[in-house]
Amino acid sequence: MGPTENQSFEIEFPNSSNTAAANSISTAINNNTTTAATITFTPANNNINNINNNNNNNNNNKFNSNFDIESNKENSINQSNINSNVNSFPLKIQTKTLNSTTTSSNNNNNNIFSIGFRPLSPRGVSPRFHSNSSSSCSSEISTPSSSTFLEDPNLIASNTISSNNSINNNNNNNNNNNNNNNNNNNDNSNNNINTNNINNNNNNTNNGENPQKKQRNSQILSKNFYSLSLHADSPKHSRSTTDLSTFLGMSDPDVMTYRSKTFCISDFHQFDIDTTTNDNKNKNNNTKSTDESSTFDGKSSNSVENNNMTIINNNNNNNNNNNNNNNNNNNNNNLNQDRPTIPTVAHSLSSNSIPHKFNSSNSLPPQMLSSSAPSLFSLLENSNNNNNNNNNNNNNNNNNNNNNNNNDNSNISINDESIVLISTPVKEYSYNRSLCLSDEEGGEDDEDDTPPTPIQLVRPTPTPINPSLSLSLSSSLNATNSTTYLHLGRSATVLLNPPLLVSSMRQHHNSPSSSPSQSIPIVQTRERSQSSLSFLSPYQQQYYPSSPELSPMVPTPLVNRIFNNINNNNNNNNNNNNNNNNNNNNNNNNNNNNNNNGTNSNNLNNQSTSEDRDDSPNTSLDQISGSPYKTPSKLSFHSPNSSAIFNSISNSQQTGKRSRTCLDFTKFSSHLLDEDSSCFSTQTNNNNTSSTGLISPSSSPKQQNVLIENTTNTTSNSSSSSSSTTTTTTTISVTNTLAAIQQNLNSNANLNNNNNNNNNNNNNISSYFSRSNSISSQRPPRPLSMSSSFISRQSPDIHISSNSLPKPVDTSNTNNNNENENDTNKLDKINNVNSNIAKIIEQQQQRNISNSNNNNNLTQDQDQQDDQFKAKLLKQLSGRQGYNGVSSESVYELLKNPTLINAIITVVDCRYKYEYDGGHIKNAINIPPTGSRQMVLDRFFKFPTPKNQQHVIIFHCEFSSKRAPDCYSLFRELDREHNEYPNIHYPEIYLLNGGYKKFFESFQGDMCEGNYIRMDDKLYQANLKEEEEKKKKEKITIRNIKAFKNRSHSFHV
């Protein structure tokens, strides 16, 4: 990306209570960055039509018809019948960072990112589903009966932004949200948003245009739709990493278009805003997602109709429950007050994902998006380091940051967070797709309605979940304003590729009523091989999508959501002690929990220093960009401006470091599963944390929790600089899939099956899982070959003793008799061998005698076989390979004194006739290239030389380079044809080295007759041409004769 580009990030909050958060972000940008940063607030009372026009005319060109006419048609919403209540439109925040005014090595490139959320008018929606339209938009918050989104009575009756009733209750609890928004700046004083008004807008009838996509089944959805529009101004990317344009599921990263899509609710696709400093964050960011494939890259926009999209700001709920947060922050405002918490992107590019968090009120601006690859287990792995990032501000800081945005925020730290929930549809497939299809091999095209290429979903049978189970939630998700989530991890049977990459994500915990054991989201793993998942309720719909965009064969981790179990806490007041959701609002209970765990709020603050270390093994896929996988498992996107933005605060803390580990679940193989085996669980009481132990499945129906204590030694930043041991608890919800974990822990960590020995079990689990906050492992083993050769391979016939070693030879019973017998056996064997050798010699002698009687004995045959390679009479010279060469001097001596050898000497001149007539060696015969075959046959093989007489034949041409070697080869070929191999008539054949030219230059006056005529002599050009034509015709004739001989001569009448 070019260094002159700007960067912007735009968020439209669908709740008026987030005005304070917007102002806090603005203040944080202006006070904590060295770059020129501005925030634009669009008042909520602006007309929706005007805002839509602004989207069509601004620099983002979100709905520019010049780039995508179809998308423009699809997103040009008819707003004529929208409710006139303009206060329902959400607040829009645009954060735009200009080029840095200072020079920084980490701020070389910039991006433009723009994200907008807005509610859409009801219109015809055509989700890219592949089942019937009646069941295409399946709601995950429906009743146990399988009802669609339109049929859900809870959705129709409720007037909430999200499909969860908890958000509505949070926004209307004690009217504290309105109070917070009234304390903001004057430009946002009228930005109070009523969620009921938003829902009223969305309840209008469909007046929009029908979708323009071909072969789509239109379906009118009349409630709670939101649009997500993105704009990323960047050139074409390579397919190395991810960027903002491909984050929301667009398939083709090489097409620069403005694109927007609308989707039905059904499942979440979340992302976080990351401001982590990273030097290598602005390289070519691109990968292909499998969420909802369509053309999307670079300058583009994406419109997602979202029912579950909301931004929850805990800071705006100043009720009695939030006062507990302030009290908790008062106890922890000393150590980390100057330390801003920087969130991290963590998301899943599939139809399933987990809720992720980012700070919206007191955090630093969302300037930078991370490029490393987090996963669903990041919440689990990073809980040890990130439990206490929210305990940074006191009550005064909360009031100042919420009500007075003009205050100095140089010491801003984060004590609350927001959650962005972007809804995308989940497809109910009745078929299985390949795990490894790429776009080139049949992937989804942007213009057709085929399902996403690499998807494989298995929908389990839902059953009600046991309400007695205590579900541990993040403390930031208060019971009054949050949604309960259950995360399902990767199953063992589908982990076929490299281990899962896990990236750290800081956990922010506001609620003092939740203990550390309650502050970690639930992570659950389950085997894919279990066909019946009866323990899941309709609120726990599981899907098993596979995403080869992460890596070719690694399926996307399971994700599960729970929408109930928090409704009981939505309308509770200060005395809400219901612990069904682990979100107690009683501060005393939280203190008791902390005391039971041997920690307090001060110790929790001490742990924040452990975030600066990166002790986990470096298993990031950044190191293997040249791997055979299509794209690295890098699911987030980034911008390099964070180093300059946080230049003023990065000197004292290194919050940009990210801990990465590999979680390997292959050791928990499916064959170790046993539904009757026990699992670890955590039983959460009302006033204290639960104990951890081994329980039987009868104690809870097929779902228990695991409480893992990871003990990490951290050094406090306090003045005493004393080292303290912080015990962080991580709660993992497991099913019978992790029954194998119990067996491994029992064998490796020597756990006892006693429920009373809780402390020992916790320590053993800690020693098994912690290892510097990382779980590293090896790749899964390759599958065994099932070929016939492998099956037929047999093990050696060796007797194995009990200790798996060959049995030694027993020599205790040996005696002299046995030794003598062994000696006699050896002599017999030697005699047998000698007799066999003697028989072979006799047979060979008999064969030689028979050959001698036929004048064709073995020795003569061997000699004749060797004669074709070496001469017996003349001294050979190194000439052309495969030919017996002889020098001109040897030929001269032989011709001058024929009596030197007892043989017939013949010199064959292979030149053309005009050359031979011009001059030749004495007594030489002329066999030109044309007609050479017949002449050789007539001259040498019609009456061959007798075997008792030797015949020496010497071939030459002008240079002995072409014509003479050809005649030499022809002569040997004809000799083979007239004899039975290895017998030949003329073993003594030679090739004159240097040809006639060299011989004439040496002995022209003595052994040569005439002169020397060159082949290319100008006086004989006509003769040369005539000879060459004859040679061509002869080659054609010979080719035809060979073809006729090879033909089949069978004729059928």
Curated annotation (Swiss-Prot):
Residues 901-1001 form the Rhodanese domain. It catalyses: O-phospho-L-tyrosyl-[protein] + H2O = L-tyrosyl-[protein] + phosphate. Keywords: Cell cycle, Cell division, Hydrolase, Mitosis, Phosphoprotein, Protein phosphatase. Residues 296-305, 347-365, 617-638, 785-805 have a biased composition (Polar residues). The active site is at C957 (cysteine persulfide intermediate). Residues 125-217, 231-253, 273-412, 438-466, 504-532, 562-638, 684-703, 747-829 are annotated as: Disordered. Its EC number is 3.1.3.48. InterPro entries: MPI_Phosphatase, Rhodanese-like_dom, Rhodanese-like_dom_sf. Residues 131-147, 158-207, 274-295, 306-336, 369-412, 511-522, 564-606, 684-701, 747-777 have a biased composition (Low complexity). It is an enzyme of class 3 (hydrolase). One of its GO terms (biological process) is positive regulation of G2/MI transition of meiotic cell cycle. Residues 438-450 have a biased composition (Acidic residues). CDD domains: Cdc25 (cd01530). It comes from the Eukaryota. Pfam families: Rhodanese (PF00581). Belongs to the MPI phosphatase family. Tyrosine protein phosphatase which may function as a dosage-dependent inducer in mitotic control. This is M-phase inducer phosphatase. It comes from Dictyostelium discoideum. The gene is cdc25.
